[in-house]
From Swiss-Prot:
Residues 25-79 form the G-patch domain. It comes from Phaeosphaeria nodorum (strain SN15 / ATCC MYA-4574 / FGSC 10173). Its main location: nucleus. The gene is PXR1. GO terms for molecular function: nucleic acid binding. Residues 1-26, 146-342 are annotated as: Disordered. The lineage of its organism: Eukaryota, Fungi, Dikarya, Ascomycota, Pezizomycotina. InterPro entries: G_patch_dom, PINX1. Residues 146-171, 199-217 have a biased composition (Basic and acidic residues). SMART domains: G_patch (SM00443). The keyword RNA-binding does not apply. This is Protein PXR1. Residues 287-299 have a biased composition (Acidic residues). GO terms for biological process: rRNA processing.
Length: 358
């Protein structure tokens, strides 16, 4: 039925805590519990249980019922988010500091912070109370002091005075162990030093080879320049670098890779140019003339043309027709009207309200 259903109004009783039922001693539950040894005010369960230490006054009191008078869901946060309670804690701390009660204010803030932390843990993980489950080993509970005294007594029994001969043997063993360790360290360091020396020699040799090659290259370049200056024409060349064809020496790997890359790029560029030229040649001359006339018509001011709701198909530079639809057609129409308005001098005067001299 929904909203059309009959309204059943429930009347709130004058006893919301249900104390009449709780105080009624003629109930079956009350009678059977009292026969088992329970009395009003006691908590349920064995009094000598492992978790009996965690019982509080709330365990013996009545269950509290909170009247729901809002549209919040079940388990929603209530009370602290009400408008009348907003900012009261901050105001109290400010007034306390002004009255010279900084220590009390700090304690109160720490207490509130601790409560918030506990509430966060409760919301995220639930209530976590440690309940002792008894002891695994032994029936008697011993204090820490007793355990400490027992361990000290055991240590005293074990530590007996050693003879002088045993002490001397220990010293000899330690000395021998120390000598062996030192010999092992020296033996490990020797191959390391040899390897280091060898690597240093190799580095020096490599440096010498590089220096010799660079000096040889410089000499070769100098002799080439001298030959070129003697045999070259008086006209200045476009680039000072010698061509790879006239270079008698073989190219390095890097230069060869660069030359190959350059040749590939040049080949690609030529292919593209040939393809473009073939396309242009294949196009009929009539299409080209039509395109040029259409572009001229578009460039002239079209103030006299009436604006229609339909979009006209546009021709791209490649000869393909493009018929805009939807958002594109509206935008193209707006661009055309804007272009025509800016190209018309009279329309611009009307927009900017400029009077023409009569």
């Amino acid at each position: 039925m929904g909203l059309a259903a009959p309204k059943n109004r429930s009347k709130i009783s004058n006893d919301p805590q249900n104390t009449t039922w709780a105080n009624n001693t003629s109930r079956f539950g009350h009678r059977i519990l009292t026969s088992q040894g329970w009395q009003p005010g006691d908590s349920l369960g064995a009094s000598d249980a492992a978790h009996a230490a965690h019982y509080t006054v709330a365990s013996q009191s009545h269950i509290r019922v909170l009247l729901k008078d809002d549209n919040l869901g079940l388990g929603a946060k209530r009370g602290s988010e009400r408008a009348e309670n907003f900012g009261l804690a901050g105001l109290e701390s400010i007034l306390g500091r002004l009255n010279g009660k900084e220590a009390e204010v700090k304690k109160e803030e720490e207490r509130r912070e601790e409560i918030e932390k506990r509430a966060f843990v409760y919301r995220k993980y639930g209530m976590m109370n440690f309940v002792s489950g008894g002891f695994l080993v032994g029936d008697k509970i011993k204090s820490r002091d007793e355990v400490k005294t027992e361990t000290q007594a055991k240590v005293e029994v074990k530590s007996e005075p050693e003879s002088d001969g045993a002490k001397e043997d220990d010293r000899k063993k330690k000395r021998k162990r120390k000598d062996r360790d030192e010999a092992g360290v020296e033996g490990e360091e020797e191959p390391k030093l040899k390897r280091k020396k060898k690597s240093m020699d190799l580095r020096d040799q490599a440096k010498k080879d590089i220096a010799a090659e660079s000096s040889k290259d410089k000499k070769g370049k100098k002799s080439k320049k001298d030959k070129k200056a003697v045999t070259s024409d008086p006209e200045p060349t476009s680039s000072g670098v010698a061509s790879p064809a006239s270079d008698p020496e073989p190219l390095t790997d890097k230069a060869r890779r660069k030359a190959e890359k350059k040749a590939r790029k040049e080949e690609k560029r030529l292919k593209k140019a040939l393809k473009k030229a073939a396309k242009e040649a294949a196009k009929p001359m009539g299409d080209v003339e039509d395109l040029s006339s259409e572009s001229e018509d578009e460039s002239t001011p079209s103030a006299s043309r009436p604006a229609t709701g339909t979009s006209t198909p546009t021709v791209s530079a490649a000869g393909l027709t493009f018929n805009p639809r939807g958002m594109h057609s509206v935008r193209q129409k707006w661009i055309r009207s804007k272009k025509s308005a800016t190209m018309d001098a009279q329309a611009m005067r009307e927009i900017f309200m400029i009077k023409t001299p009569s």
